[in-house]
Swiss-Prot record:
Motif Nuclear localization signal boundaries: 336-342
Full protein name: Capsid scaffolding protein
UniProt keyword Ribonucleoprotein, yes or no: no
Assigned GO CC terms: host cell cytoplasm; host cell nucleus
Any matching Pfam family: Peptidase_S21
Organism: Human herpesvirus 8 type P (isolate GK18)
Gene name for this UniProt entry: ORF17
Any GO molecular function: identical protein binding
Region ranges (Interaction with major capsid protein): 514-534
Source lineage: Viruses, Duplodnaviria, Heunggongvirae, Peploviricota, Herviviricetes
């Protein structure tokens, strides 16, 4: 076991700025108290019960305050030797230097120096006690450039610092050589291993510790080879290492362990993100998807480059001007704007053993809803519900159709009667029906003022009874068709009520204002259920 080791390094560098005011030592004020030739305790991490040696002098040099000392505690040196025997870093080879496991472990464990002194504000006055209390070996000093170098020879230690001039080096070595290690008292090293281990664990969490040690070595200007780990890394092991369990080629850094539930959640989120959604269709001016053309319906032409153009309407068809005041674009049954269609379920994969596909739950829920709808239908049949009579003519069916749009020429807009002229409210423009002899007759306008209807108006040919007669128009003058105003002054409502037969009080009546259509109710319930499933 070594009788003693020398340590040397800067405890303050003048040219290096300080981040905290308490760390700044004014060279003009400190010079009055240097050099310090009396021995000061050398401790570990500023712990009072960890004295491991004594300082041999604090000297003022051009680069800062340089410290030299000796580690003479037998207990600490024995502990450091045991650590070096079991440390792989201590047995790593070093270029251009002999193998020294003890020096390697000290440079790895305690590579920094820290000076304990009074506060700089008290230096302006005459201090009542000593200015410097002790020097500590630590994992990283608070002042930059305070890095330690350990060695068996004091001259070798001081020669590692190129920032110390030859004259300053000679002055330091002259004083160190006059000190005998045998004359120094035995340090009081009684610190338990738990305290030292706790300090070592705390040092492992210092952020960018290795980079800061490299900076300290550069600030101290240590250019000669040394045992510092700030610039050299282990490249191999000189001893035979014990066998270890086999590991994958990917290494421990590439392998992580997470709970199964978290992995399944991440996988499901990734699958949901990969599902493509349907592109939104552009809003057209002619209705949600279809436009009327006589008695036929043609799809609208969406102006999207990815879609193939739709077939054109028949010859002679005139597109309706969407900006006319009476233009109405109905909503087709079963069409929902702004809703995404449910995509087909993937039955091939993305399921783990023991998992239940999501669409099974949807099927069970929809089956339950269908059963409820069937029970409601049976209840309606038991209550004796009967539908009203259907329309008796094509003109009347066109009049009550909420999805009808007329065929008209946008180049010659027609003038239709207003609400004040007939006393009723129009839902759509009047309907033009072509007679067999090539003439047009005007159908009766649709009115809201009939709460009870038992029989529809009787039609004669293609003209509705009660409608104002239309004068015949020659076939040659069909370029511009204009509406004929009614000749009589009575309202169409009165004509309908006059010609309609007297309703039978015993017949079934359908109150449109108090009872809704069961078909609409069922459709609404089914649509709401599908919306909730989206």
């Amino acid at each position: 076991m070594a009788q003693g080791l020398y340590v040397g390094g800067f405890v303050d560098v003048v040219s290096c700025p300080k981040l905290e005011q308490e760390l700044y030592l004014d060279p003009d004020q400190v010079t009055d108290y240097l050099p310090v030739t009396e021995p000061l305790p050398i401790t570990i991490e500023h712990l009072p019960e960890t004295e491991v040696g004594w300082t041999l002098g604090l000297f003022q040099v051009s680069h800062g305050i340089f410290c030299t000392g000796a580690i003479t505690s037998p207990a600490f040196l024995e502990l450091a030797s045991r650590l070096a025997d079991t440390s792989h870093v201590a047995r790593a080879p070093v270029k251009n230097l002999p193998k020294e496991p003890l020096l390697e472990i000290l440079h790895t464990w305690l590579p920094g120096l820290s000076l304990s002194s009074i506060h700089p504000r008290e230096l302006s006055q005459t201090p009542s006690g000593p200015v410097f209390q002790h020097v500590s070996l630590c994992a990283l000093g608070r002042r930059r450039g305070t890095v330690a170098v350990y060695g068996h020879d004091a001259e070798w230690v001081v020669s590692r610092f190129s920032s110390v001039s030859k004259s300053e080096r000679a002055h330091i070595l002259q004083h160190v050589s006059s000190c005998r290690l045998e004359d120094l008292s035995t340090p009081n090293f009684v610190s338990p291993l738990e305290t030292l281990m706790a300090k070592a664990i705390d040092a492992s969490f210092i952020r960018d510790r290795l980079d800061l040690l490299k900076t300290d070595r550069g600030v101290a200007s240590i250019l000669s080879p040394a045992y510092l780990k700030a610039s050299q890394f282990p490249v191999g092991i000189q001893a035979v290492t014990p066998p270890r369990p086999a590991m994958n080629s990917s290494g421990q850094e590439d392998i992580i362990s997470i709970p199964k539930s978290a992995f399944l959640s991440m996988l499901q989120s990734s699958i949901d993100g990969m599902k493509t959604t349907a592109a939104k269709m552009s809003h057209t001016l002619s209705g949600p998807g279809l436009m009327g053309c006589g008695g036929q319906m043609f799809p609208t032409d969406h102006h999207l480059p990815s879609y193939v153009s739709n077939p054109a309407p028949p010859y002679g068809y005139a597109y309706k001007n969407p900006y006319d005041p009476w233009y109405y674009s109905p909503q087709l049954p079963g069409y929902r704007t702004g809703k995404r269609k449910r995509g087909a379920e993937d039955d091939e994969g993305h399921l783990f053993p023991g998992e239940e596909p999501a669409y099974h739950k949807d099927i069970l829920s929809m089956s339950k809803n269908i059963a409820e709808i069937q029970s409601e239908l049976k209840e309606m049949k038991l209550n004796g519900w009967h539908a009203g009579p259907p329309p008796s003519s094509s003109a009347a069916a066109a009049a009550v159709d909420p999805h009808y749009r007329p065929h008209a020429n946008s180049a010659a807009p027609c003038q239709f009667p207003t609400m004040k002229e007939h006393g009723g409210t129009y839902v759509h423009p009047p309907i033009y029906v072509q007679a067999p002899h090539g003439q047009f007759q005007q159908a009766a306008p649709i009115l809201f003022a009939q709460p009870h209807v038992s029989h529809p108006p009787v039609s004669t040919g293609l003209a509705v009874v009660g409608a104002p007669p239309a004068e015949p128009t020659p076939a040659s003058s069909t370029q511009s068709i204009q509406q004929q105003a009614p000749e009589t002054t009575h309202t169409p409502c009165a004509a309908v009520e006059k010609d309609a037969p007297t309703p039978n009080p015993t017949s079934n009546r359908v109150e449109a204002s108090s009872r809704s259509s069961p078909k609409s109710k069922i459709r609404k319930m089914f649509c709401e259920e599908l919306l909730n499933k989206q």
